[in-house]
Amino acid sequence: MITGASSGIGKGLALDIAARGAKLGLLARRQSLLDEIVGAVKGRAIAVTADVRDSQAMKAAADRVREELGPIDMLIANAGIGTSSHVAQLDPDHVANVISINVLGAANSVAAVVPQMVERGQGQLVAISSLAAYRGLAKSAAYCASKAALSSYFESVRIDLRGTGVDVTIIHPGFIKTPLTAGREAKMPYLMELDDAIPKIVSAIEKRKKSVAFPWQLATVVRAGLLMPTFMYDWIAARNSFRE
């Protein structure tokens, strides 16, 4: 089951995984886009319109996927949005929406599938997080906070599920050409084509890795930022906004 499957990373994963023979429950709010993907994979998927912010809708969606396709072996929590704003112009409602979709939406998705996975003693939960989870970035307060929360949430879930047969994989990609990054004028370092990013994500899922970050060049820089003195990191980050 893939959330946020109508475009970007979610769509790319759906097409790739379906080509490998899997049956998919594709969730998003835009039915027409989901229907296009279902048509492209020739019946190996069903489209389910659902809003990840609605816990009951997510439970109903998971029930439908199980009824039509059988037990859910994997959840890919991909649904997410971003926002770009200096804190002085930040709209609290926009912040709430980002947190609601990126974090609570993932929690609702997990709650809809994990009890059955634990009962069966097998399954995999995958979170599509971001390198933005590691440290704050300029004009990205809501997005960075949501991805940091998402990564920590799934890390805690992984610890809770230790020994149950349910694995947890957290993906931390850098900049990828998707609708989320389209239209930005700022140069995004190591910007990846979607077709190059999808195999890396699928490989990590297949190997059931606990966590993966890519591209390695940008991941190395970001991790180095964790070791920098705060004054140094702030000086560098303030001069590099990727949200323009």
Task: Locate predicted features.
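Conserved glycine-rich cofactor-binding loop
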Residues: 6-7
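Conserved glycine-rich Rossmann-like NAD(P)H-binding loop of the short-chain dehydrogenase/reductase
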Residues: 22-37
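The beta1-alpha1 cofactor-binding region of Rossmann-like NAD(H)/NADP(H)-dependent oxidoreductases
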Residues: 49-60, 92
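Substrate-binding pocket helix/loop in short-chain dehydrogenase/reductase
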Residues: 86-87, 91-99
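Active-site helix of classical SDR
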Residues: 110, 146
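Residue(s) in the substrate-gating loop at a strand-loop-helix junction
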Residues: 130
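C-terminal helical subdomain
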Residues: 170, 186-221
